[in-house]
From Swiss-Prot:
This is Citrate synthase. GO terms for biological process: carbohydrate metabolic process; tricarboxylic acid cycle. The gene is gltA. It catalyses: oxaloacetate + acetyl-CoA + H2O = citrate + CoA + H(+). GO terms for molecular function: citrate (Si)-synthase activity. Might regulate the synthesis and function of enzymes involved in later enzymatic steps of Krebs cycle. Loss in activity results in sporulation defect. Belongs to the citrate synthase family. Pathway: Carbohydrate metabolism; tricarboxylic acid cycle; isocitrate from oxaloacetate: step 1/2. PROSITE patterns: CITRATE_SYNTHASE (PS00480). Keywords: Allosteric enzyme, Transferase, Tricarboxylic acid cycle.
Length: 377
């Protein structure tokens, strides 16, 4: 029997200049620059442009890109109507998937797969994802949809459209950092799905709808939502040890812990942990953070030797919650950030495209003959 790489783990199918991960040492870089530096010194707008062009932009290039994003934030009235008419209680990821597909119907450039068109569509989608997600949330709540503002950052504008209130500079910066941390992460399931769709020479909207479908699955997106559910079940910090110990003793999964790639601390979780502590203390919402701190200590003590540590989802939910974001929208916000990585990866792969066509080891019957249905047992 051939060697089968279940889940394609460790299989190399292409080259990339965008993102490097060393899971055993907890290293994540974009264009060779550590994620910690991107989070501390950059913005989501700059990282998005850097990923799309696979290079650090100049000040002029960044200013032009920022202006393009702001100019393309508004979504067509037809799409606003579709979002308003969606059934109440629909899963936000279903709504996002439908909205992006419909957006493609309205774009006269949608079927153009030239490099120039892919790049232009990517810019528009990065700008419009935030407007779509905020509009879905408002419509589902029966509230008026808030139009985007061109005087706010990408992160600040999203929070404004979501809540109807202009965020403080600190809130906008915190959310910006969260977007930076989630913008790209190598060949994860959704990025691979987008590339697989692109490899057939399909359009950018189909690639992004494919990626959204992959991200919707609970084994990819949704872990930070599950972390918040776990925190609510625990309730108070004094109950954390018994809860987690019981889960571990029964070999049950702890949400936000462990990673397919990282066998050490997820570097993104270390960045978010510091910000989560700061915001929790400032906003007087330290209960969640105290529970997470207690859980982390137990996990590191009992599971660290096995390479199991908190991942980025462990703290991101509390950050989003403290910003007033409901947990059902944590995964759409993942897409809001990852759209940059999806688009950049599709653009990069398209430069030397080859149709993805893996194989499977056949394990079924051989040398059989058709049996008439009346003679079958």
């Amino acid at each position: 029997m051939s060697n089968i790489a279940k889940g394609l783990e460790g299989v190399l199918f292409t080259e990339s200049k965008l993102t490097f991960i060393n899971g055993s040492e907890g290293i994540l870089t974009h264009l060779g620059i550590p994620i910690q530096e991107w989070a501390e010194k950059s913005t989501f707008e700059e990282l998005s442009l850097a990923l799309l062009d696979a290079k650090l932009p100049t000040a002029e290039e960044l200013a032009k890109f920022d202006a393009e994003l702001k100019a393309n934030r508004a979504i067509p009235d037809q799409l606003v109507g579709i979002i308003r008419d969606m059934p109440k209680g629909v899963h936000p990821m279903q709504a996002l998937r439908t909205a992006v597909s419909y957006l493609g119907l309205l774009d006269p450039q949608a079927e153009d797969i030239t490099p120039e068109a892919r790049r232009a569509i990517s810019t528009r989608m990065i700008a419009q994802f935030s407007t779509i997600i905020a509009a879905i949330n408002r419509a589902q709540e029966g509230q008026d949809i808030v139009a985007p503002r061109a005087d706010l950052t990408h992160a600040g504008n999203f929070l404004y459209m979501l809540t109807g209130n202009e965020p403080t500079p600190e809130q906008a910066r915190l959310f910006d950092i969260a977007l930076v941390l989630h913008a790209d992460h190598g060949m994860n399931a959704s990025t691979f799905t987008a590339i697989a769709t692109s490899s057939t020479l399909s359009d950018m909207y189909s690639c992004m709808v494919s990626a959204i479908g992959a991200l919707k699955g609970p084994l990819h997106g949704g872990a930070n939502e599950a972390v918040m559910t776990m925190l609510d079940e625990i309730g108070t910090v004094d109950k954390a040890e018994a809860y987690i110990t019981g889960k571990l003793d029964n070999k049950e999964k702890i949400m936000g812990v462990g990673h397919r790639v990282y066998k050490y601390f997820d570097p993104r979780s270390r960045v978010l942990r510091d910000y989560a502590e700061h915001v929790a203390n400032k906003e007087g919402k330290s209960n969640y953070y105290q529970i997470l701190e207690a859980i982390e200590k137990i996990i590191v003590d009992r599971m660290g030797a096995k390479g199991i540590y908190p991942n980025v989802d462990f703290y991101s939910g509390t950050v989003y919650s403290d910003l007033g974001i409901k947990k059902e929208y944590f995964t759409p916000i993942f897409a809001l950030a990852r759209i940059s990585g999806w688009c950049a990866s599709v653009i990069e792969y398209s430069q030397d495209n080859r149709l993805l066509r893996p194989d499977a080891e056949y394990t079924g019957a051989r040398d059989q003959h058709y049996v008439d249905i009346k003679d079958r047992q």
